[in-house]
């Protein structure tokens, strides 16, 4: 018997939206006077910081960058977040899936490990806000901490929720350890997976 879900929980980057880091990288290179190797380290430092805390703060991230020798300031971070608000490309099949979900009275949550200031605006510019019922951003809780998954439930029973994301640790292992069903999307299977989910919804 096919399982019926009432809430679908999505990661954002590489799941709903396809990020293009080039403009943001160029902004950082110019404002921080970084060479190519130092620029690459920015993202590994973000990952390191996320592993040390349960939620993001701008001051905390700025301080961590400075500890690592990156001359980040709050103003530069704010400018970077604004620059990245323009990453609004929606993956093929996403809109159709969200339309089908709402057409069948399903609840939709999004969970992201990045700042609300950036991610909410991206969803708005991409035209996806109206489909989403619950938002969990890195300012509130970070995956794979259980608080992130708990907030995404919005009191929906775990067995009625499906988590969908690209990162195996945060979007598959984390949700499953918390008691959620989860499916991984990749560049190879993303469109097929969204078609499959849409078909299952129509068959319920």
Go through each PLM region and give its residues.
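Active-site neighborhood of HAD-like aspartate-dependent phosphohydrolases
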Residues: 1-44
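Short, acidic loop-to-helix structural element flanking the phosphoryl-transfer center
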Residues: 59, 82-109, 146
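Alpha-helical elements of Rossmann-like donor-binding domains used by nucleotide-donor carbohydrate transfer enzymes
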Residues: 23-27, 60-64, 96, 100, ...
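A metal-dependent, Asp-based hydrolase signature
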Residues: 34-37, 47-82
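Generic recognition of short, well-ordered alpha-helical segments
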Residues: 20-23, 92, 96, 121, ...
């Amino acid at each position: 018997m096919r399982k019926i879900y009432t809430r679908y929980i999505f990661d954002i980057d590489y799941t709903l939206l396809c990020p293009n880091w080039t403009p943001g990288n160029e902004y950082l290179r110019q404002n921080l006077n970084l060479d190519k190797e130092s620029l690459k380290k920015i993202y590994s430092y973000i990952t390191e910081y996320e592993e040390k805390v349960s939620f993001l703060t701008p001051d905390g991230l700025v301080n961590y960058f400075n500890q690592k020798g990156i001359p980040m300031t709050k103003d530069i971070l704010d400018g970077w977040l604004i620059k990245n608000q323009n990453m609004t490309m929606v993956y093929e099949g996403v809109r159709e899936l969200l339309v089908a979900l709402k057409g069948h009275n399903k609840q939709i949550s999004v969970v992201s490990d990045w700042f609300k200031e950036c991610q909410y605006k991206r969803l708005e510019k991409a035209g996806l806000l109206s489909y989403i019922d619950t938002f969990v951003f890195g300012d509130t809780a970070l995956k794979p901490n259980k608080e992130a998954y708990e907030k995404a439930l919005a009191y929906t029973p775990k067995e009625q929720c499906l988590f969908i994301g690209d990162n195996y640790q945060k979007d598959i292992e984390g949700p499953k350890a918390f008691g959620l069903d989860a499916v991984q999307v990749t560049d190879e299977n993303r469109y097929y997976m969204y078609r499959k989910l849409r078909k299952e919804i129509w068959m319920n």
